[in-house]
């Protein structure tokens, strides 16, 4: 899924995003 992929990238890119989209990271 493009959405999941983008989420993973964002999460790995910045820790701030990780906290904001931790669910996406865990899901991916």
UniProtKB/Swiss-Prot annotation:
Q: Which reaction does it catalyse?
A: a 1,2-diacyl-sn-glycero-3-phosphocholine + H2O = a 1-acyl-sn-glycero-3-phosphocholine + a fatty acid + H(+)
Its Enzyme Commission number(s) read: 3.1.1.4
The primary location reported for this protein is secreted
Organism phylogeny: Eukaryota, Metazoa, Chordata, Craniata, Vertebrata
Keywords attached to this Swiss-Prot or TrEMBL record, sorted alphabetically, are: Calcium, Hydrolase, Lipid degradation, Lipid metabolism, Neurotoxin, Presynaptic neurotoxin, Secreted, Toxin
Q: Which GO terms describe its biological process?
A: arachidonate secretion; lipid catabolic process; phospholipid metabolic process
SUPFAM superfamilies attached to this UniProt entry:
Phospholipase A2, PLA2
Q: How is the cofactor bound?
A: Binds 1 Ca(2+) ion.
Its protein name is Phospholipase A2 3
User: What does the UniProt entry say about where the protein is found?
Assistant: Secreted
Question: For this protein, what is any one GO molecular function term?
Answer: phospholipase A2 activity
Annotated signal sequence range? none
């Amino acid at each position: 899924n493009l959405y999941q992929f983008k989420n993973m990238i964002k999460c790995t890119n910045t820790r701030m995003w990780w906290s904001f989209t931790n669910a996406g990271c865990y899901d991916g």
